[in-house]
Amino acid sequence: MQNSEENKRRGGSRGFSFFARNEDGMRRVEKEEIQRVIVQREAKSYKGDFGRLLLIGGTYPYGGAIIMAALAAVHSGAGLVTVATNPDNLTALHSHLPEAMGFDLADHQLLCEQIQKAGVILVGPGLKEARENHAILNMIFEQVSSQQVLILDGGAISLFAASQFDLPEAQLVFTPHQKEWEKLSGLDLASQTEGKSRRAVQNFPQGTVIVEKGPHTRIWTSGQDEGYQLDVGGPYQATGGMGDTLAGMIAGFAGQFPQVGLYERVAVATYLHSAIAEDLSKEAYVVLPTTISKEIPKWMKKWSDNLNENVENETFS
């Protein structure tokens, strides 16, 4: 991968000290730690306190991807969500999610304005690998700052891996599935072991968060040797849009919960995504991503109110 030496100077997120180890030596999320992230909202707060998000993607024929990401972001509590997408998707977006704003991705002037306003930018769900999108990714890289969170998912990962771009001075999150991780790390599927992935993560700018999606999803950050591995989730999640929904949840959490670091927010969002799916699988052969999104507010309410005793222990331990 390509990055500048300047990127290496950026400080990483603080240690995720409130995780317990599993049998493989990786760490796992404990109930108490989820409650440290998902806290009750202050009485005197407004939508601007909970993240201004810009989601970019949904080029033809992948309009559903960006809509599912937006659904997850809004249901995760994001304060303001704006979607830059193919104009053919806007009617469907507003039909499914009137809470979100949307505009034509081809309107580069408006896109630039929205990039400057956003605190969290998610690019990639349903983003086709095309020349015009290569230019859009370059535009984003040139404009984002160290104060912004930039999440690269799906098509944005492939576009970046095929480019010669230097990574920007933003707070970076990558959410690759196994083939996308191969493009980023150079590790084929058989080589994506715990140890080799750990070493590959260190090639990214310090503080970069990597969600290495797979049968046993791992979460890493550059600058720390230890990673975290999910012990929830399963094959009932193997359906289109699951990763888009996860990316939207991560974006939603990234815009909130300043009492903990970005790494913590990403890890808990990733965990909650699979924990909800596991619970739903008790009554469903396949769990749809949009069904997960509908459940997010209920689960966040339980955690923030310390009511998780109503949820079966095995779902979260």
What does each of the following model-derived ranges do?
Residues Q2-V149, S158-A170, Q178, E182-S317:
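Small-residue (G/A/S/T)-rich helix-start motifs and N-terminal tracts that mark the onset
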